[in-house]
Structure formats: structure tokens, C-alpha cells
Amino acid sequence: WLLALIVIALGVSLSLLWLMNDLDWYRGFSGCLYGLLAYRGVVSLTDRPGFAATVLVFTGLKLLADSVMTGDGLSADWIGAAVIWQAHITGAVTGAVVGVLCLAGGHLLSRRRPSAAD
């Protein structure tokens, strides 16, 4: 989890720096939270598909709502500030990529390696 969080935080920060280089006031953690949700959803696909689908669908719906209702949406009212939905999107994408890489790495590690007897 910690390594995934670090990679997600770097992904969000670098993406915002590249995509929105005029944004100098963002201090949130929400992009990382979306990234962790996407990461957990992806890595759970193999052993808990129902849970994974639920997490991914609801995360996707919230991302859609945030991107459509920019400015004075419900999330902005809750936190008393503008919502930087781009951080949510980049966090979720980064988290999903990290999850896919973890699944691929786990799949490669779980393959049976030939022994000396083979």
C-alpha cells in the first residue's frame, strides 16, 4: 500500500504540474484517495471480483459526477473549496496502472519455475 501511495502521489503531482502548470494552490489529497480506490479495485479483480466491480463502478461514477459538476458541486460545498477534478482523474488512472502492474507482476511471480529435476 505504501509504495502504491507514493507512486500515486507522484503521478498526481507530476500530472497536475504538466497539465495545469498554472495551478499553484492545490494542496489536497483527494487524487491519492481516488488512486488508492482504483488500485484496490484492480488488484481485487482476481480474488474478489464482486467487491472490485463495486469499488470501480462507484469510483467511476464519482469521477464522472466531479468532472461534470465542476465549481459549485456537492463536493465543493462539503469541503468549502473548488474541486480539482483533474487530480481525481489522474489519481484514479495512476492507481489503476499501478494495480495492473501489480497483478502482472504477481502473475509472473506465481508462474511455476522449472526446477533442476525438470
Predicted regions mapped to residue ranges:
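Hydrophobic alpha-helical transmembrane segments of polytopic
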Residues: L5, F51, V55-F58, G91-V98
